[in-house]
Amino acid sequence: MRTDWILADFDDTLAPGDSHAGLLRYILRRRLWPLLLLPVIALGGLVYLVPSRRRQGISLIWWAITLGLSPLGWRKLVRAYCRTRPGLFCEARALLMKDGDRCWVISASPRVLVRGQLHQQLPGKLPHRTLGSRMHYRLGGLMPRFYCHGQHKILPEIRALTVTLALSDSLHDLPLLAQGAEAWLINPTPLRLQKAQACLPHIMTKRWRL
């Protein structure tokens, strides 16, 4: 059994930007009529601000924006959006090229979205495992069946690993970062770094660029 696993967030950690929010905006711009459901989208945004209700909030947003979208249309939009993404940070690309076979990428973004971006950037060199939010259809729209965010990233299979390195840009991922013997905070603001160090004094900062 390996004892040198790496756990990595995706958005703003391996690649710049929030591809989850970006995909939602991309779908909305190409469908437009879900703007009629803007009150539902806004309500979802407000509910999302309540930490214990994040999954319900993001589900409302997803449902309103994807209502009536076919599975084929969903796959086409994901593929098209992946082609617009800027790529991986140079340091992230080097990490995955060298150590991808021991890397678990764990993201709040839909798994199909993360895998699509990784496949485009590293064809034939995907990480050991890619975990993300699992989507399903309900009442005519898409929503997360499982929202892989924050503490929920620490799945039983993750707890069973011996992790040498964990990396993320987000304070929501402190539980993930705490799994690693070594932890990297990617491109933090001074305030974010201060908050992270209060919980994980050993955390290191990394400045990554495209």
Please annotate each region the language model reported.
Residues 26, 77, 179-180:
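Generic alpha-helical secondary-structure signal
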